[in-house]
Structures are given as structure tokens and as C-alpha cells.
Design a protein with these regions (language model features):
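C-terminal peripheral helix-coil segments that are non-catalytic and often amphipathic
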Residues: 1-11, 107, 139-150, 175, ...
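Basic, helix-initiating cap at the start of DNA-binding domains
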Residues: 1-37, 41-50, 67-70
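Short hydrophobic/aromatic patch on the recognition helix
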Residues: 51-62
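Hydrophobic alpha-helical connector segments
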Residues: 71, 85-114, 162-166
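Helix-loop "lid/cap" segments that line or gate small-molecule binding pockets
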Residues: 87, 103-110, 121-124, 149, ...
């Protein structure tokens, strides 16, 4: 991976694109620059320079910088939805479901830290967009909690609030890692985070 100053070859990993393609380099360069400077502060010229492509190449793949920025967010948002959906369908109990969901969030954070952190930072910008049929991992989690309440596996309460409480116990450590306060892999801490999330969900 190229370093933060982009002095060498661009990172070839794609977000939605095939690794090694021009589109992949554009996505990865934009991701890194958006993380460093914010979406609004980055120009398409800077993205093109970091990706080592002509500026016009960006518009062959994305209608605008904002479309590119949103596409990066939606990619990890959809990825988390798929991971959570699988975790919930494979779970044998409520406790197992909590452990699995925490595990897949930690897995996603470790597999592509830059993309996961981008999702975390830009949730307020893109996460509030209302679009029919949009896959939403948090909705899946809240619905699972509501079912657990109906089945007596979780104390009654507001499923959305409990989902926020449980996810916060995963996402805040991820934010600490992003700030350099928590070294190491998220998956290493997954058992402790799952235990804490389950305790929060079981609280009256």
C-alpha cells in the first residue's frame, strides 16, 4: 500500500472495482484522501494525481466526486449488511447471534481499516439518506433484538436504543483505534466486546 503522502505506486485494491484497474486506483486514492482531508476539501485533480490517472478518468466511472464518495460508503454499508445477515441466520441462540454480529463488525474493521473508518466517519453524511430498498445493517440488528424480546431472550425495551447501545460498544473502540489510542486488531478484542454488548442488551 502506498503511504499517506502517496509518493509511490497507488494502492491497487478496489472497493467496488476489480483490483488493479484504473477504477480501483481511483476508489482507493479517493478513500485515503477523503479520510485525511474530508470529502469537501479534496478535488478530483488530487484524486487523479494520487491514483495516477487522468482527471477525466474519474468521470468515466463516477458522475461526480459526491457520487464517488457515496459509492464508497454504500460499498461498506452493503458489505456490513451481508455480514450481519449471515451472522444472524447462522446463529443458534440470541447469545450466539450477538457474538457473531460483533465478530463480523470486528472482522470488517480488520480486513479493510480505511474503508471501515470511512464508514464510521461518514455515517452522518450518507447514513441518513433515505432510499427505498437500501440494505441497512442496523435495521437488521434492531429487528433481531425485537424478535429476541418477543421470545423472552432479551428484556423489553426500545430495540433501536438497545441496538445503538450494543453497536456503540463496538464502534467506539474502533474510533479509539482510529485515533491511535487502541492498538492491535479489533478481532482480538471481539470476545470482550461481545460480552459487553450482551450485558448491555440483557440489562433491564
Amino acid at each position: 500500500m502506498a503511504n499517506d503522502a502517496f509518493p509511490g505506486a497507488p494502492d491497487p485494491r478496489g472497493v467496488t472495482a476489480v483490483d488493479g484497474t484504473a477504477k480501483a486506483r481511483i476508489e482507493r486514492a479517493a478513500l485515503m484522501l477523503f479520510a485525511q482531508e474530508g470529502v469537501d476539501a479534496v478535488s478530483t485533480r488530487e484524486i487523479a494525481s494520487a491514483a495516477q490517472v487522468a482527471e477525466g478518468s474519474i468521470y468515466r466511472h463516477f458522475k461526480s466526486k459526491e457520487v464517488l464518495a457515496e459509492a464508497l460508503f454504500e460499498a461498506i454499508h452493503s458489505r456490513l449488511f451481508d455480514l450481519v445477515e449471515t451472522a444472524l441466520s447462522d446463529a443458534e441462540s440470541f447469545e450466539d447471534a450477538v457474538t457473531r454480529v460483533v465478530g463480523v463488525y470486528c472482522q470488517a474493521a480488520d480486513e479493510d481499516p480505511a474503508l471501515f473508518e470511512y464508514h464510521l466517519i461518514h455515517m452522518f453524511r450518507f447514513g441518513r439518506i433515505d432510499r427505498d430498498g437500501r440494505p441497512d445493517p442496523v435495521t437488521l440488528i434492531a429487528e433481531a433484538i425485537a424478535r429476541a424480546m418477543e421470545n423472552g431472550d432479551c428484556p423489553p425495551g426500545d430495540p433501536e436504543l438497545k441496538a445503538a447501545m450494543a453497536l456503540g460498544l463496538v464502534l467506539q473502540p474502533a474510533a479509539h483505534r482510529m485515533a491511535g489510542r487502541l492498538p492491535g486488531l479489533m478481532t482480538t478484542n471481539a470476545p470482550a466486546l461481545a460480552h459487553a454488548a450482551l450485558a448491555a442488551l440483557k440489562a433491564d
